[in-house]
Amino acid sequence: MGYCEFNIAHGLNKIAINSKIKKNYPYLKAEDISDFKYKLQKLDAHPIIKKALLFKLHTGVRGAELLLAEPHHFDLNEKVWKIPALHIKQFRRKVILGHEIPDFLVPLSDQALDILKDVMQWSYGEKYIFASPRKHNQPIHFNTLNMAIRKMGYGKHQLSSHGLRSTFSTILNDSGLFQDNWIEAQLSHIDKNRTRASYNHADYLAQRTEMMQWWGDYLSTAK
């Protein structure tokens, strides 16, 4: 039996203490997208690493959610990624404590689906979609993504892997086309004002599906 490099329970004892601490990550502005795509295309790195960064930008997910993704988490026909609640930051503690929480649903744009299909060919037979090129049945390490960004020429104060998620959030909000609660639901953020005791994993799924396709088209045509 193999071991995963990620300790998904790490830091649970600090959740209550750090829950109000918010860190701002450097991110791409709208006018920076085209240059990022060019640098990523020219980057001398394994294709899976490059595709991981691109897929992260297209989906707006966190690092652990991305790197712990397995083939059976995806429904290619329905174009949906079903992320286990254990992999979601906000839900992890409840799952470990025994609560039953459904998978979190991430709609996939046509572009994200194409990226996924390419990666699945390279990682066929591996446990993880974004498999380590060096270690069997292990995902690529989170630090590998930031190292790749450094190789692209971005300093620590210019862009980080998590900053791709911030890019996603910022541009969607700035577009003025989508409601805040759709974007927050896509980011798996729990609405502090909601009265329901449980989180609905399918919140605004139809709206988020349309929004994610807009985002995929936006990234494809960014110049």
Predicted regions and their residues:
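Catalytic-site neighborhood detector that most strongly recognizes the C-terminal catalytic loop/helix
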Residues: 19, 27, 85-91, 113, ...
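Feature representing long, continuous alpha-helical segments
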Residues: 34, 38, 64-67, 81, ...
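Membrane-topology and secretion signals of cell-surface/extracellular proteins
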Residues: 3-4, 45-54, 63, 78-80, ...
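Conserved tyrosine-mediated DNA breakage-rejoining catalytic core shared by Y-recombinases
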Residues: 10-17, 68-118, 191
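Short, basic (Lys/Arg/His-rich) helix/loop patches that form interaction surfaces
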Residues: 38-49, 59, 120-129, 133-134, ...
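Short, polar N-cap/turn motifs at the start of nucleic acid-interacting alpha helices
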Residues: 2, 73-80, 156-158, 177-200, ...
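C-terminal catalytic core of Y-nucleophile DNA break-rejoin enzymes
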Residues: 22, 90-118, 126-148, 154, ...
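Basic, Lys/Arg- and aromatic-enriched nucleic-acid-binding interface segment
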Residues: 4-69, 77, 122, 163-165
